[in-house]
Amino acid sequence: MKINDFMQWLKTQPAAADIPIELGSINGNKEKFIALVPITLGDIQAIGSPSSYNAIGVSLRMRYGKNFTTAQNKLKELQSLFEKTENADMNGQLVYFMVNEGQPTYNGKDIKGVFEFTLKIKIFYERK
């Protein structure tokens, strides 16, 4: 499984329907935007047998308007999506999400006054 598979899946979810999503860095020209950036995970403890699952790490970096409450609510909606989704199917692989550190990180506002947050996610997937 690749981060692109996750991006394509996320684009189909109602919680992310109103936000452009791309791989790489944040697009500072858009008021609403999600950038998905791969992050390195430490050693992963085996789930099931050592060869049955693997994981990738993703940093979801979100910009969402100039109203803090609206931006925070959108991020909570996305966080809830990951916490409540069990056995998602991405290209025939079963996927489970774990939100790292429990809470998103508030990154502040950019020079245009747009609020930015980061949510770190571990994506466990069934190996084929």
Identify the function of each model-found stretch:
Residues 2-3, 124-128:
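Short hydrophobic/aromatic patches at helix-to-coil boundaries
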Residues 83-124:
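Acidic-leaning, charged glycine-interspersed low-complexity segments
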Residues 15-17, 29-33, 55-59, 112-118:
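A general secondary-structure boundary signal
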Residues 50-56, 95-98:
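A short glycine/small-residue-enriched secondary-structure motif
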Residues 47-52, 110-112:
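Short, solvent-exposed beta-strand/turn "edge" segments of beta-rich domains on protein surfaces
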Residues 64-87:
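Mid-chain, well-packed structural core segment of small domains
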Residues 52-66, 78, 115-125:
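Oligomerization/assembly interface segments of phage tail-like spikes and tubes
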Residues 1-49, 85-91:
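Small/polar-rich, solvent-exposed N-terminal microdomains that initiate assembly or binding
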